[in-house]
Amino acid sequence: MKIPLTPIRFLRYAREQFPNKVGVVCGDQRFTYLQFAERAARLAGALVARRAQPGDRIAILSTNCHRLLEAYYGILGAGCILLPLNIRLAPQELAFVLNDAQARFLFVERPFLPLAQSFQTTVPSLEITFLLDGQPEADWLAAQNYDNLLAGGPPFECDFTQVDEDSIAELFYTSGSSDRPKGVMLTHRNVYLHALSVLAAGQTSPTTLGEMSCTSVLLHTIPLFHANGWGTAHTITVVGGTHVMIHHFNPIDVFRLMDRERVTTCAMVPTMVAALTHSLERANYDLSSLRTIVIGGAASSPTLVKEAQEKLGCACISGYGLTETSPTLAKSAMKAGLAWEGDQRYASQAMAGFAIPGVELRVLGPDGKEVPHDGSAIGEIVVRGDTIMQGYWRQPEATATAMRDGWFHTGDVATVNACNYIQIVDRKKEIIVSGGENISSLEVEKVLSAHPSVYEAAVIPVPDAKWGEVPKALVVLKPGMKATENELLEFCRARLSHYKCPRSVDFPESLPKTGTGKVLKRELRRQYWAAEKGVVS
């Protein structure tokens, strides 16, 4: 017997097995899995009643809230494709995504209503806008109220045995940090098997770091429109754990929810972890329930891992993946048989880690062959497995470029050691080539981050008449701390080969970032290459 693989089955299972258990916490509201599933089914019914067709793209523009989580199941239950929108995108970028996807319906949170109103003239395919909170009578008459929508008709129970598991379930657009956003098509099968692979990965370490269970309480600190955020939504549902929603990341609010809801785990980007470790407010809250923080979205560092474990009292491991891979490919929990301690252990936990079950991962050199597993030879990470995307939406050429010879080419350059742990060196297009030598910006950034005065650092190439390009550091200092350019350059020279060291340091007040805290190096490079032709990429 073959039954289609679809994440719709996860919420159906949680409703049947954990009906009275609190499944979702959002502000002062609490929903059992029975209530959560009922609301998702009513959303599906409302969409079907409004003649939503199988394959329609339905967009949602919202911060993390219970309604966004309901959309993950209700939209799929109606046979449609979920299209989460990045709230940090500029209006013209959002309009591009909506037009590219040809979205029919839009769900929008009240703060973003002005954007939704502008889409009436810039996005011809949009037919109906639903207001997630607030009242259309007071805010915008053209919108329809979400809760009235759910109350207005019966729930719709999708017959998941009739779902095509290879049809598109979710359409996520890449961040566009280096080029225009591309729509990543993830199928029902992709999403279903990713959740099971992540659950299995939690059992591949004797310490069970990152393990999910019915006792898990997950704080959604990363926006659900981002890979690191939505990658956990289905995993916690199928085991009957508890979702805790937070609209915006703020250390005090995070600490308060961790204390009040007895949060056990969360995923964060490095800048979020750094903000928690540097906040003096943590002393006012009980964080003893917190077991694990999974760091992803950008490269971590041994210094950050050590500081977080010491100050937050929990384990920190790294996760690696991409939007195109559903997203998780690897985790850095320590395998059985290894006995790393001290600095070696912190270094291993800051690595991308080893492949999770169901993923085949290789590091290939320029000749197309696997690099030696010596921790120093570099190559591009390629992967294959059941969680790899179907392709890029309406971009067959980009799909063909990324999916070659049966493997997805990630564009990430890495090393692999004798224990099969990978270490990300850089994005392929962000390797600095100075006088013929390859320099990893991440390697230099990790050294700078170890300086006691440095809060965060970014290293980019800048033009140089002799070497073509040389590394330059942009450093944000910790509040109240000081450091000079010469001090930081000497710090690097004591720890790096001379050619890898930055030639200069600037001290901006902040670094431009995506909605999830990833530094926009494209914006930084543009400032320094403005006088050069065709170099910004």
Show where each model-derived region lies.
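Conserved beta-loop-beta connector loops within the AMP-binding
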Residues: 358-382, 416-419, 481-485, 520
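Gly/Ser/Thr-rich phosphate-binding loop
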Residues: 238, 260-268, 278-347, 360, ...
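AMP-binding/adenylate-forming catalytic core of the ANL superfamily
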Residues: 89, 106-108, 258, 266, ...
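Conserved pre-ATP/AMP-binding loop-to-beta segment of ANL
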Residues: 19, 131, 136, 151-173, ...
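Conserved AMP-binding A3 loop
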Residues: 32-34, 169-197
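Structural core segment of the AMP-binding/adenylate-forming
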Residues: 49-50, 77-148, 479-481
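Conserved AMP-binding/adenylate-forming core of the ANL superfamily
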Residues: 3, 20-65, 69-73, 90-95, ...
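Conserved AMP-binding/adenylation subdomain of ANL enzymes
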Residues: 192-217, 225-264, 279
